[in-house]
Structures are given as C-alpha cells and as structure tokens.
Amino acid sequence: MADSGIEQAFSSALLPTGTRIACRIEYDGSGYHGWQAQLKSSSPTVQGALEHALERVAVQPIRVHCAGRTDAGVHGHAQIVHFDAPCTCSAKAWVLGGNSHLPPDVRIHWAQPVPEDFHARFSALARRYRYVIVNSAIRPALSSRQLTWQRKPLDAVRMHGAAQALLGEQDFSAFRA
C-alpha cells in the first residue's frame, strides 16, 4: 500500500486558482542571507529562491509565507510555507516543477491544499530547534555546515542544567527583531 503522504505530494488532481497551498521545504541556509526576501538588496534569500521557482511554474507572481523566518546561515529541515495559487495547477506540478527551478540546496518535499484560513506562521502548533555541538580535538569535515565545533572540553552537566530553562513551552517574544 502506498504512503498517503507520497500520494498527496504527487497528486495530479488539478487545484483551482486561489487554492491555498501548503508545502514542506528544507534548505541549507549556508549560502543565504536568511529566509526573508530583501526589497533593496540583491543578496540571496530562501524566500526569494522559492518564490522565483514557483513563479516559473505559475508564470505569475507568488508571495510565500513561512512558519518561521531564519537568520543568515540557518538551515530549515521541515519548514512549512503557504501561498495562494495564482493558477490552476496540481500538487505534483508545484513539487516537481518548483524543484526543477530551485538550486540544489533548497527542496520542496510535498504540497497540498489547505483551508483558506490556514497560515503557516499562525497555524503552527509547535516549532523545534536543533543545535549540534561537536566536542573533539579535530574539526569534522563532513556536515560541518550543520554543526558547531568546540575543541576545548565542555562541562556537560552545567550545559544540561542551563538547557532545562529552554525546555517546554516558552515565550521568546522579547528576542524578536
């Protein structure tokens, strides 16, 4: 039996103009100046790359909204985005067509119609962040963009204690830009 997520990601059923589409994307943010497109800058952003690719599929402008903006160099593993389809198109066309116009460090994993009141940012139930610290004498060569390296010994007990304050549901609104 086929996985329903795969079936939906590649559904050939046409979705009418105006349908709100949600997508799961992933990206290596190393080469980008964050998520958000900058009006007066030619610096590459993930939003800019994604909108450009989807606009090539639709042959019309598209504005993409995300669950959470990331800073320069930050990666996204399961970022949910949405847009209102400016044309009749299938989920398969959004995924495969979008990916054909994206650079290799940005990918659309699935696309599906969602209710018109869905919003990637405000409908999110949770967000998860992962930080990887490698503590070794030698800096790793593989996956070096997805981690931070520390040569000197770390105090794991103190780090664990400090991290407890971050667990659970928190209000980090004071840290917003």
Features from the language model and the residues they span:
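Structured-RNA-binding interfaces characteristic of tRNA pseudouridine synthases
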Residues: 2-177
